[in-house]
Design a protein with these regions (language model features):
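Short functional hotspots at interaction and active-site rims
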Residues: 1-199
Length: 199
């Protein structure tokens, strides 16, 4: 982690400035209607309990990226997250970004599997990928977006259907994308302050 903060990331940041590239941080998360967080109340000595939502558990995945200029990109994934879906996301990100993208992600196996490496080699003029140190999610600003989304879902009326969960997720993510100042607050956490002024 120290090497990342003292050497690796400063080198990435310097390259981004020299090449007029944007640095984005990406991550995947599972979105579920059974994720219970927040506060509750019960009499002293009694463990608080919450009711689970009616019906079957609903779940899907989302991949997203943020940068310290307040930009946010996201994609809902119905089914298993794999190389093909990662490539679709990176293609969309590279297409929409006005400059070359330096994408920082964790070391999930799919992030550097053969199909992804081959695609990146063909598109290296538009996008490059860099990897965070292993077991260091706290260094990724996109983790704050994930926490923001899950807080929004778990503090609202429970979503009992897949469609309801998808609707709430989409509404929240559209709001985040349209709120650059909100995205910038993700970079105020002490663990990711290193990334706040790097481009």
């Amino acid at each position: 982690m120290k090497k990342w903060l003292d050497e690796e990331y400063p080198a990435i940041s310097a390259r981004a400035k020299a090449e007029n590239a944007e640095i984005h941080w990406a991550d995947e998360t599972a979105v579920m209607n059974t994720d219970v967080r927040g506060r509750s109340y019960s009499p002293r000595g009694v463990t608080p309990a919450t009711r689970s939502v009616w019906g079957a558990r609903q779940r899907f995945s989302m991949i997203s990226s943020v940068n310290n200029q307040g930009k946010c990109y996201w994609m809902i994934i119905d089914g298993v997250f794999n190389a093909d879906r990662l490539i679709v996301f990176m293609e969309s990100l590279a297409k929409d970004a006005p400059r070359k993208v330096f994408l920082v992600m964790d070391n999930l196996k799919v992030h550097h599997c053969k199909p992804v490496k081959e695609w990146l080699e063909k598109n290296k003029e538009r996008i490059e990928v860099f990897y965070l140190p292993s077991y260091s999610p706290e260094l990724n600003p996109d983790e704050r977006l994930n926490a923001d989304l899950k807080h929004a879902i778990t503090t609202s009326v429970p979503r009992r259907t897949r469609q309801g969960l998808l609707k709430k997720t989409t509404e929240h993510m559209k709001m985040v994308k349209a709120s650059p100042e909100r995205v910038k607050t993700y970079f105020k956490d002490k663990h990711v302050a290193y990334a706040a002024d790097s481009q």
